[in-house]
């Protein structure tokens, strides 16, 4: 009887806990896979937007300074 209890405990408690940990890893892998399939042109646009920074003013409205009083990085 004790052996059957141990087997049931392993099958009903420990095995599901082990599989839940594996399920938690899948969304991260899917996200990384989606990033790899990104078009290189789209990836460049994302990087360029990040490199421009927060203080960049809109080129059409540029008067040489951003709202924080610093020099614009996009229009000099």
UniProtKB/Swiss-Prot annotation:
**Disulfide cross-links:** 56-74, 57-72, 62-75
Q: Which GO terms describe its molecular function?
A: ion channel inhibitor activity; toxin activity
Q: Which residues form the signal peptide?
A: 1-20
Q: Which residues carry this modification: Cysteine amide?
A: 75
What are the UniProt keywords, alphabetically? Answer: Amidation, Disulfide bond, Secreted, Signal, Toxin
Q: Where, subcellularly, is it found?
A: Secreted
In the record, the note on similarity to other proteins reads: Belongs to the conotoxin M superfamily.
Q: What is the protein name given in its UniProt record?
A: Conotoxin reg3.10
Q: Which organism is it from?
A: Conus regius
